[in-house]
Amino acid sequence: TSTDYFISGFDWPVDGVITGVYGSQRILNGKPRQPHFGIDIAAPTGTPIKASAAGKVVMADDLYFSGWTIIISHGDYLSSTYSHLQEITVQSGDYVNQGKMIGVVGNTGRSTGPHLDWRINWLDKRLDPQLIANKHP
């Protein structure tokens, strides 16, 4: 059976300024690349990041492009991804409550400044967090 850890909705994982929106076109070396499938939230390095909804940490690792990255499974094939962290404070297999600190804002991987790249995923689809999350603080 599946547990719906997202029953209370999704909270914003960090307070900050939205600097990149879902679906925006990315340009790399002057060439268009695939659209951005998350939102970028700028905040100072070291700003705490909280789990947007309860769930199980299914990945916490340092990846080439996204730097320190966490994926939390919320049940029913729904997950959230947090990338470019400076530090992670959870590990794969941990269960987290909504609002638990999972890491801090950083500038790791392919990044141009300290921010959180936050994504919500359903199966292999990416969803716009701004349409799903509770009101932005």
Q: Each predicted region: which residue ranges?
A:
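Surface-exposed beta-loop interaction hotspot
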Residues: T1-I7, D15
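Catalytic cores of peptidoglycan-degrading enzymes
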Residues: D11-P137
